[in-house]
Swiss-Prot record:
Composition bias type Basic and acidic residues, residue spans: 708-717
Name of the featured protein: Vacuolar membrane-associated protein IML1
Organism name: Scheffersomyces stipitis (strain ATCC 58785 / CBS 6054 / NBRC 10063 / NRRL Y-11545) (Yeast)
Topology of the protein relative to the lipid bilayer: Peripheral membrane protein
Record carries keyword Transmembrane: no
Gene coding for it: IML1
Coiled-coil segments: none
Subcellular location: Vacuole membrane
Main location: membrane
Cross-referenced PANTHER family: DEP DOMAIN CONTAINING PROTEIN 5 (PTHR13179), GATOR COMPLEX PROTEIN DEPDC5 (PTHR13179:SF8)
Entry keyword annotation includes Membrane: yes
Length: 1489
């Protein structure tokens, strides 16, 4: 039979005796094996070869026996001496070529089942063998210009070491085998053809400059990107290579760049820039509907039609063609001018004072598959947008028009960007496991120039420098004749022009327009509106151009061109040191000379003039290097006409700049090129340099020992530019580049400053960028992990404050870290996760080298070593913060924090008044009927800042170092709801189970699955099966059920499993003063006695073991003695007690401890009026010092005054029922809390989401699941984690969901916080406020006192049940019972309103106190389901039906609320079905259908 994994699809085959084709039978295998050991009297001759061309004579030797092997020997040779199929002999065993010479081999192919390695090689086929780490290049001999494949030798791709390949390829005598998919198609190599491989000696020649990896349907966090990139170092990749991360398919390589060219394969070194692009991102498109959007374009097309008929359809088509899974939000926005002053009278940098901003949400987190519905909504909203914002209804039939839209230059683009950035305020709020990035796209009809406020521009720049969101601006107008994007503002009475480095700009041009058509760049309204035949045309007639006698003729111009082109050229490969210094000195002299006349470029090299000519042209993207923001430049030309025309054709070419004239670098010296660069700097350019001293020092100190190449000189020149940039006096230079004259010429190096940004490494070097950055729009790039942005040593010393602390690993930690190497990795990963970048480059090396005394440049790392990281140090930056993490050779972790000081100017602005006014625009969400004021300040809301000392101590295992209020990490909430019973549902033999019984069994299995997945350090094998916790099911009212459990305990003494024992009356959030009082209470506290040890008497002390036992018995959130010991150590650190001789920490054993003086019971010594009468005032202050090490005294009394789950001021006064909020009113309050029955209704499990052990670390999440459940309500599962890999969490959730589906259940993700908080978190999230047209609370027909007194919202609950809504969360009012206290393992419930969810999980509704409804789509569930469905090949019908049904739920519900007849009929039905047993929180279960 045919071999399943080794095949020869392209070559001819022979059939064996069994009739199968392409077979290597066992008989031929034995024959081929025998060929390896021929006797001396035998020889093997290969006649012909596969696909080898004949000689020039055209005669073939034994042509009829081509591709055969003849064994020649004695007459009595063995039977094995026969003609076999083609076996390529190993000629290298007899001929030893030079290692630098190519080695010819015959290529085979294997599939993924054999091995996932791209290349499997037989080491015997290579002279001298192969070794791990060697890099080889493979190239086909079939064609001259074939692709080159690079691969690295490792243990897995050597045939002798690859067990799977050895077994599957044992029937073949192959020398090298490639994976068939995709290499066979990409390389276009037929099987069994000849290839050559060559060892690469100098890896720098093949090391890629940049690699772009595309990811989809996975949330690859920034820390995972760093780990992923580190696994790629010292490996080779090729185009379309699928990459694995933690044994999961994660990305695919799409682009590899080397020296400005896109290559097929490359070697990834430590200096290679790895860029991640997402094909499943969250896109927010902000469309500016300014005044120009209703204007005609120069070609007669309305701007908005250009948007909806050209731009958006092309974008959606590109997304669909690439099979991307983006979730898109489209928002229309504009700014209305409410003044009577024409905007044309405003100066540059000025805007009207009286403005009103509008935002209209068209679609909200909709999958781009529904592009047709999106476009329909977009056209409809555009038609009504201007009417809705301009018409103001005064009375019933009276309307007024207020204001008119401003043009884009005076618009609110920065306000819109700030409002969108509010989603980035809390980095832990994004728990979408299917989408990786957030990206903003601003579409404007303007030309890329905007008048803004200086303070707002500065604040926006600061925010953009601290978040990882990208911003693209797309202009619908023609590119202007100035630098773009350009922001103007007025500062100190002067108008400033700046180019920001945190955004990119594109200019959309319809591809259908003719390339020969001329479109004016300047818009002259009077000229556009003038008729062609009008006489006024004569008024603007231009006089005929008079040619002077000095102008050269065309013949003279061509002669001059030929003379310049063919004149002798001095070939100089290197530049001398003195020449370089001379050039540098000349450059400095020119820069210091403020007044100089522009020089004329005479007798310039004609070839160079084709590239560097100064003719006037706009080059917004075509000639700008790719590592920069898009900068359109205007240049002025002295060049002749012929060279100008020649350049017109050159500019349209798609090749890189370096490819325009490949002979320049080889024929022209560096000095001439540098001279050309200097001469091009004639015109006045913006001076961003503080002083020239650093530049001079750097030039003078540059004394290379050997001649430098062009590349090294260029790199050094750029490095000097960067250092000059960072020596600038203006602190805003890190955000933008100030331009004195936007219409003046600027070299690429001058405009390099804005390229030095956090996004610089996202773009490959020396690549010409397109007019429209389709790649960025199709697949947005993630913020690079590394950055070269770093301040100079001088700035670090003068403008930064310095802090330092050490981190010690507690081996009893939540993350199960065992070494400081692992702790250092977690600290780096957490910073990357929260937006930090790794600083790497010459500036960092210089700063480290000048550190005193322990600076060591060689120990700087970009990626963490795999095993030991002793001595390693790494710099990381975010905004104004720089962190240096250093692991010394003793295993101690040292963290140094640099904070940039606030400038005097900023201090002046902030004194006495706010810098920026509050910004609450009018927003109309997707389903809202009118505009309403935003619930969040779009400008003054800032990203959350973190205390990194607390974070590091928390990672090290000291969880008490961080207050509970700050432990607001990643959280996910799931509800398990009834669903249709599938055909393959669970069943028990010979038993007929009802649907409810099947679902109950499914919940039991789900909880058993979670319990079995608990993380265990060491697996304990037991003969007996573990007894797993069970869910307690009930029907009816929850409080009735708990009261029944409490009464059973009072009557029988048998404590229910849900109850907390009477002794467990505290938890870890108790105040120290209250705990000290309890510990010293005679009846219930510790035995405090006077003890003698070694003739020393210790008064009023206790044993460490006694305190551990007491904590284990009395604290509800302490389960083991280890936890009690750790908590006791934290109490000791906070100053509650100490060792009697101050020789030990807190230990579980026979060790004596005594209370500190401020907490000791003074009545033991002398009688005083009260407790803690002499307590120090300082002890009441919380620990707020971020630099305090773990083992220092502090006091957390104030921290426990408020629960993390409750607001500081609760209108319902819920503090009186919270066990963690015991007041200081005395023993009576404590006794009152003890009499209350306490129930904990959920259980926390430390769950291992990586059950297969794929990761290099424990992947742990905390899972909270309900211990009680009413089948008529939703069952809850909550997840919490800090830095666990999202891919493993997604896999665990998928497994849970599959189990639920087999038992008629549905796992639905819902927001952790209640629904009413959404508008204050996400301003663009859709929601609907709905009022019942018939309010049963006030309607005389239904306001029955008997019903409303028993259940105020009975009619509303009946209405919700009719529309298949299930109870999700109860309001906090429900838990305010004096007799019973309810708590959960995840905290106290704090929902203000009762919340319900539809049975399909797509919509959530809140019931307000006044009987109104607040309805919002469950976007996180809809997005997850749509992403999953679009991944299925045949998904069109299912996803369309699902999305339509989800929207229909809202439409039907809103329609019913507005239907008076329907509501009255339904309420009458509800009144007739009323029964006494319907409690407050219960929904009727037996409604008539």
């Amino acid at each position: 039979m045919q071999h399943a994994r080794i095949f020869n699809s392209g070559g001819q085959s022979r059939r064996n005796h069994s009739g199968s084709s392409n077979v290597l039978s066992s008989q031929s295998l034995s024959k081929s094996n025998s060929m390896n050991s021929m006797s001396a009297s035998q020889m093997s001759i290969q006649i012909g070869a596969s696909r080898v061309t004949s000689s020039s004579s055209g005669n073939h030797f034994m042509n009829r026996n081509m591709r055969s092997t003849i064994t020649v020997g004695k007459k009595h040779a063995p039977i094995e001496q026969q003609i076999h199929q083609t076996q390529t002999p190993n000629l290298t065993s007899t001929v030893q070529p030079n290692l630098k010479d190519p080695i010819p081999l015959t290529v085979w192919f294997h599939d993924l089942r054999t091995s996932d390695e791209d290349v499997i090689i037989d080491s015997n086929a290579i002279p001298g063998g192969v070794r791990n780490g060697q890099v080889y290049m493979l190239q086909s001999l079939e064609t001259e210009d074939s692709k080159k494949l690079l691969f690295v030798i490792n243990d897995r791709n050597i045939r002798d070491n690859n067990a799977a390949a050895q077994d599957d390829l044992q029937s073949s005598k192959f020398q090298i085998s490639l994976i068939s998919n995709p290499l066979q198609k990409l390389l276009d190599i037929p099987p069994r053809s000849l290839v050559q491989i060559k060892r690469i000696q100098n890896l720098a020649k093949v090391e890629a400059d940049s690699v772009e990896i595309f990811i989809k349907d996975v949330n690859l966090s920034r820390d995972s990107m760093w780990n992923f990139s580190s696994t790629l170092v010292n490996s080779c990749v090729h185009i379309d290579k699928r990459l694995l991360f933690l044994n999961n398919r994660t990305g695919i390589v799409k682009y590899i760049y080397k020296n400005g060219r896109n290559v097929f394969s490359g070697y990834i070194g430590e200096n290679t820039k790895v860029t991640f692009r997402s094909e499943s991102a969250k896109l927010t498109v902000l469309v500016q509907l300014s005044r120009e959007m209703w204007h005609f374009e120069e070609n007669g097309e309305i701007m908005f039609h250009k948007l909806v008929n050209n731009l958006f359809p092309k974008m959606f088509k590109r997304w669909r063609d690439r099979n991307t899974h983006h979730a898109i939000t489209i928002v229309l926005f504009t700014s209305m001018d409410l003044t009577d002053i024409p905007w044309t009278t405003l100066g540059q940098g000025e805007r009207p004072n009286n403005r009103r901003d509008y935002f209209r949400v068209v679609v909200d987190q909709v999958n781009i598959f529904h592009w047709d519905k999106i476009m329909a909504n977009l056209r409809l909203e555009f038609a009504n947008f201007k009417r809705d914002i301009m018409l103001n209804q005064q009375d019933t039939n009276h309307y007024t028009m207020d204001g008119e839209p401003l043009p884009s230059v005076k618009g609110n683009i920065l306000e819109a960007v700030n409002l969108g950035m509010t989603l980035a305020n809390n980095r832990f709020i994004n728990t979408d496991l299917k989408h990786s990035l957030n990206h903003y796209i601003v579409v404007t009809p303007g030309t890329g120039i905007y008048d803004v406020d200086y303070e707002l521009m500065l604040e926006t720049s600061k925010k953009m420098s601290t978040i990882d969101y990208g911003l693209d601006i797309i202009c619908l107008s023609q590119p202007p004749l100035h630098v773009v994007p350009l922001f103007r503002f007025s500062k100190d009475g002067k108008v400033k022009h700046v180019v920001p480095n945190w955004c990119d700009i594109s200019y959309y041009k319809d591809s259908n327009q003719s390339a020969n058509s001329w479109i004016p760049r300047c818009k002259i309204y009077e000229l556009q509106m003038m008729g062609v035949m009008e006489n006024n045309m004569n008024q603007i007639r231009i006089d005929r151009f008079q040619v002077t006698q000095k102008a050269p003729t065309m013949i003279e111009a061509m002669d001059n061109y030929d003379n310049d082109l063919f004149k002798p050229v001095n070939h100089r490969k290197y530049i001398k040191e003195n020449d370089e210094k001379a050039i540098d000195s000349y450059e400095i002299k020119e820069k210091n000379n403020s007044k100089f006349k522009p020089t004329t470029l005479k007798n310039a090299n004609a070839t160079l003039s084709l590239i560097f000519n100064n003719r006037t042209r706009l080059q917004p993207t075509e000639l700008t290097p790719s590592n920069s923001s898009v900068l359109g430049t205007v240049t002025h030309s002295n060049g002749e006409a012929l060279s100008t025309l020649y350049n017109l054709n050159k500019i349209s070419d798609d090749r890189t700049i370096s490819s325009l004239a490949p002979s320049i670098s080889s024929t022209r010296s560096i000095s001439s090129k540098r001279s050309m660069d200097i001469l091009r700097k004639e015109t006045h350019s913006p001076r961003l340099i503080k002083s020239d001293s650093l530049f001079k020092t750097e030039t003078g100190a540059s004394t290379p020992a050997e001649p430098r190449t062009t590349k090294s000189v260029e790199r050094e020149r750029k490095s000097r530019h960067l250092m000059k940039h960072y020596e600038s006096e203006n602190p805003t230079d890190i955000f933008w580049t100030e331009i004195e004259n936007p219409s003046q010429e600027y070299r690429a190096d001058t405009l390099l400053y804005p390229n030095v940004s956090r996004w610089s490494n996202a773009f490959p070097d020396k690549i010409r960028r397109r007019l429209v950055k389709w790649r960025s729009l199709q697949s947005p790039a993630a913020l690079p992990i590394t950055t070269s942005v770093f301040p100079s040593v001088k700035i670090l010393e003068t403008e930064y404050t310095f802090q330092i602390y050490n981190v010690l690993l507690n081996y009893e930690n939540y993350l199960e870290l065992e070494t400081t190497h692992e702790l250092m990795r977690e600290m780096i990963q957490l910073r990357l996760l929260l937006g930090f970048q790794i600083c790497f480059g010459d500036q960092v090396k210089k700063a480290e080298s000048e550190r005193k005394p322990a600076g060591n440049v060689e120990s700087l790392i970009k990626y963490l070593p795999r095993h030991s990281s002793l001595g390693a140090r790494i710099y990381m930056s975010l905004g104004d913060e720089i962190h240096r993490i250093y692991l010394d050779y003793n295993g101690n972790l040292n963290v140094q924090l640099y904070h940039k000081t606030v400038t005097n100017e900023e201090n002046k602005i902030t004194l006495g008044q706010a810098k920026l006014t509050n910004y609450f625009p009018l927003i109309r969400t997707r389903y809202a009927d009118e505009y309403s004021t935003a619930k969040i300040d779009g400008i003054n809301s800032k990203p959350k800042m973190y205390n990194w000392n607390q974070f590091d101590q928390y990672l090290a295992g000291y969880e008490d170092a961080m207050p509970d209020a700050n432990k607001d990490f990643y959280k996910m909430k799931f509800v398990v709801m009834p669903a249709p019973i599938p055909k393959n549902a669970f069943y028990i033999t010979n038993e007929n189970l009802t649907d409810e019984e099947i679902r109950v069994e499914g919940l039991r299995k789900l909880i058993a699955m979670i319990e079995k997945g608990k993380y265990l350090k060491r697996k304990v094998t037991s003969k007996k099966e573990e007894i797993l916790p069970e869910i307690v099911f009930y029907t009816g009212n929850l409080y009735d059920f708990l009261n029944e459990e409490a009464q059973n305990f009072d009557n029988t003494g048998n404590q229910a499993g849900l109850m907390i024992p009477e002794s467990m009356r505290f938890n870890k959030s108790i105040k120290l003063s209250e705990l000290a009082e309890e510990l010293q209470t005679r009846s219930t506290g510790l035995p405090l006695v006077d003890r003698t040890w070694h003739f020393k008497r210790h008064l009023h002390c206790f044993l460490g073991s006694e305190l551990v036992s007491w904590l284990l018995e009395c604290f509800e959130d302490i389960q083991t003695r280890d936890e009690a010991t750790s908590y006791g150590q934290s109490l000791m650190n906070k100053g509650l007690f100490k060792h009697v001789e101050s020789r030990h920490g807190f230990l579980d054993g026979y060790y004596f401890y005594e209370f500190e003086s401020e907490y000791i019971d003074k009545t033991y010594i002398e009688s005083k009026k009260g407790w803690f009468g002499i307590k120090k005032t300082s002890s009441e202050k919380p620990d707020t010092d971020s630099n305090t090490p773990v083992y220092t005294r502090n006091n957390s009394d104030v921290e426990s005054l408020s629960s993390p789950a409750l607001p500081s001021q609760d209108p319902l006064d819920l503090k009186r029922i919270t066990s963690t909020l015991i007041t200081d009113s005395g023993a009576s309050s404590l006794e009152g809390s003890r009499r209350r029955k306490k129930f904990i209704l959920s259980r926390a499990v430390k769950y291992n989401v990586d059950s297969l052990g794929k990761s290099f670390r424990p992947e742990i999440v905390t899972v909270h699941y309900d211990r009680v459940h009413n089948p008529e309500h939703c069952y809850h599962i909550r997840l919490q984690w800090l830095s666990t890999t999202g891919r493993f969490i997604d896999e665990a959730i998928t497994n849970w969901s599959r189990l639920c589906e087999r038992h008629g259940l549905k796992l639905v993700e819902t927001p952790w916080k209640e629904l009413c908080n959404i508008p204050s978190i996400s301003p663009f999230h859709s929601f609907v406020d709905i009022k019942l047209c018939v309010n049963p609370l006030v309607d005389p027909e239904f306001s029955d006192v008997k019903i409303l007194r028993k259940n105020r919202f009975y009619y509303h609950l009946y209405f919700l049940k009719k529309f298949e809504f299930l109870l999700d969360n109860r309001s906090s009012l429900f838990f305010s019972k004096d007799s019973i206290e309810i708590s959960y393992s995840w905290g106290k419930p704090s929902f203000q309103y009762a919340q319900y969810i539809h049975k399909n999980g797509t919509y959530i509704i809140e019931l307000r106190d006044n009987g109104d409804f607040f309805l919002a789509p469950n976007n996180i569930h809809i997005t997850r389901v749509n992403t999953t469905l679009t991944s299925i090949p045949d998904f069109d019908g299912s996803i369309t039906t699902y999305n339509t049904n989800s929207q229909q739920v809202m439409l039907n519900f809103r329609s019913a609320c507005q239907n008076e007849d329907y509501l009255k009929e339904l309420f009458r039905e509800a009144k007739s079905n009323w029964r006494e047993e319907f409690p407050l929180d219960m929904m009727p279960t037996d409604l008539p259908q």
